[in-house]
Amino acid sequence: MSNPASKKADLRLALVECADDPDRLSRLLSDDSITDLDLRHALRGRLPAAVSAFVMEKSKFGTRQTVLGAIARSPSSAVRTALQALPGLSWRDLADVAVAAELAPAIRQKAEALLLDGITAMRLGDLITLSRIGPRRVASRLLLFADARVRAACLHNARLRDGDLCELLDHPETPREIASEILQVHRWATSYPVRRAIVRSPATPHPISLTLIAEMNPGDLRELAQSDNVPPLVSAVARRILG
């Protein structure tokens, strides 16, 4: 077992063979040569659910953050076991779990909720990374963050959709800078629904909204001209364009 890859494969096989025998599992996991990373790698593969439960509840590895991340991330873990592991995870593992489509919705949603709860305690660099790779709901929340670097990273999150930005632009706490930041990203700058939401948003500076309003289709111009929910200047310009 001197080859690292072979050692990890052998550990996974040994865990499978011991899955139904708690005494054998206990002896196996008491081996001091097994590292947290060895076990993390083994647990990420397909294993009987009993293995994850035993590791977390009855072994010395049950409080190790690295190992708990693998337990929560493994589709082989029972939902109850994965949920119990989540509070001990690093934010990176929580983000990984939250976007893993093969995991049960209850697990992904709990991981997402824990991320949202922990945002205020995270370092700026970690927030920037999370903004780029995190789940939609987390990225949407971080679009309201005061630091422009966090918002810029969010706008490059591939999981965001047009509707997320449209909802953001209608939010009462939307930063005034967000419209110009959105338009700097090609994906959003070429999205008609997003440009329309920018025009409608009270947070958008007039020079930006007035530049975009001429691109609106006739139906949207009529709606803008008649709406009481958009800035008065936007309505007035829409009426002028319509003649």
Question: How would you describe each model-predicted region?
Answer:
Residues 1-243:
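Alpha-helical scaffold segments
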